[in-house]
């Protein structure tokens, strides 16, 4: 598998084409997920354990819990920032191990994480602020 593909896959079925577009975005998602992972690891350890526990119950034996952790983490963050009125209807948990569904979930999670990062601050920026406030004491 090459990381860069020069030709674009064209699929006649519009439904399948969505998945092709998803696959083409994977590199971007990996960066977002890496940032999300670091955000998750910067959380309070008890909360982090709770997030992982809830997610592992939801997904059973899915082989990559990170995307599901991200999914739940963003939902929890939205709820804690905005109250329980966070967009629950458009953000349901889908514990389906099917790769294509996970692909779509991952895209939704990545978009939601980006929205949260834009609204409340990126983990990298938050870490910088924390370090500078620690240095001033």
Swiss-Prot record:
Source species, domain of life: Viruses
Protein name, as recorded: Uncharacterized protein ORF137
């Amino acid at each position: 598998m090459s990381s860069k593909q020069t030709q674009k896959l064209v699929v006649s079925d519009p439904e399948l084409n969505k998945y092709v577009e998803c696959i083409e975005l994977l590199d971007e998602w990996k960066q977002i997920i890496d940032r999300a992972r670091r955000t998750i690891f910067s959380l309070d350890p008890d909360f982090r354990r709770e997030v992982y526990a809830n997610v592992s119950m939801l997904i059973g034996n899915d082989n990559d819990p990170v995307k599901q952790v991200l999914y739940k983490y963003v939902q929890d963050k939205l709820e804690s920032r905005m109250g329980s009125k966070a967009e629950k209807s458009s953000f349901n948990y889908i514990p389906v191990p099917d790769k294509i569904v996970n692909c779509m979930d991952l895209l939704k999670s990545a978009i939601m994480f980006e929205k949260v990062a834009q609204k409340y601050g990126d983990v990298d920026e938050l870490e910088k602020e924390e370090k500078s406030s620690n240095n001033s004491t």
